[in-house]
Amino acid sequence: MTAPAKQIVIITGMSGSGKSTAIRALEDSGFFCIDNLPVLLLPKLTELAGGGHFERMALVVDVREGVFLKDAPRILAEVRRAGHQVEVLFLDASDDSLIRRFSETRRRHPLAPNGTVAEGIKAERQALRDLRELADQVIDSSTLNVHDLKRMVQARFSPEPAAGPSLSIMSFGYRYGVPPQADLVLDVRFLPNPYFVPEMKGLTGKVPKVAAYVLEREETQQFLEKVVDLCRFLFPRYQKEGKAYLTVALGCTGGKHRSVAIAAELTQRLTDEDTRVQLWDRDIEKE
């Protein structure tokens, strides 16, 4: 009797990018998790976990693999051929962000115990280059705190089934930077800003009167119709190319009013039985 197929998430990426946070997020979501399992043991693990045991597993694979890291592409292909669903999540961050994090924790880089963190980062990027190219999704954690990263990972690997793509709608403020993980970025700063209406300045786009101020305009409705049409045009074509997860980011100046209202409305319009949509207001709580 053939063992049931398993959902296997391989978490990899740069040291200091948030792999520990990601594996804990999946553990909290019901995954059986192993940190630093030698990749050569993955086929044996799936064999030992046959039957109905550990149907959802998450593993960390990183530079601690050493010389065995080069075997990762071959091993992952072998496990996929066995019928298992294998997804690779690569966590990254800018060099400046990684250096700052190492400085804050006073840790040495694993690839440069006697050198600088910058030297270790450079060597690690080279070592992980092939694995990064295999990634089904790359998350840049440069601007994310641990709570944001946990929320993103859990949303990405939610067990809820969907026949179509999984979609993340994100509102953000340009003053805090464009989210690097976005596949599509749409600027809604052409719409009138509730910030300049005294009674709305301290509110957000989640408040009904603020949302109405943004949404009850002809140009807003035209914009939403065009964005929905664009998304529905793109989704099946992304799926055809093997991309099952999309992030659409909507930005205004501060990420509190216009983008929040538009993101909520877009989420409502795009959610159906074939598409799982996750809404995330990245900057709504920032000062």
Swiss-Prot record:
Record Pfam families: PapZ_C, RapZ-like_N
Family annotation (InterPro entries): P-loop_NTPase, RapZ-like, RapZ-like_N, RapZ_C
Positions bound to GTP: 62-65
Record: residues binding ATP: 13-20
Record keywords: ATP-binding, GTP-binding, Nucleotide-binding
GO molecular function: ATP binding; GTP binding
Protein's job: Displays ATPase and GTPase activities.
Family from the record: Belongs to the RapZ-like family.
Name of the protein in question: Nucleotide-binding protein MXAN_6564
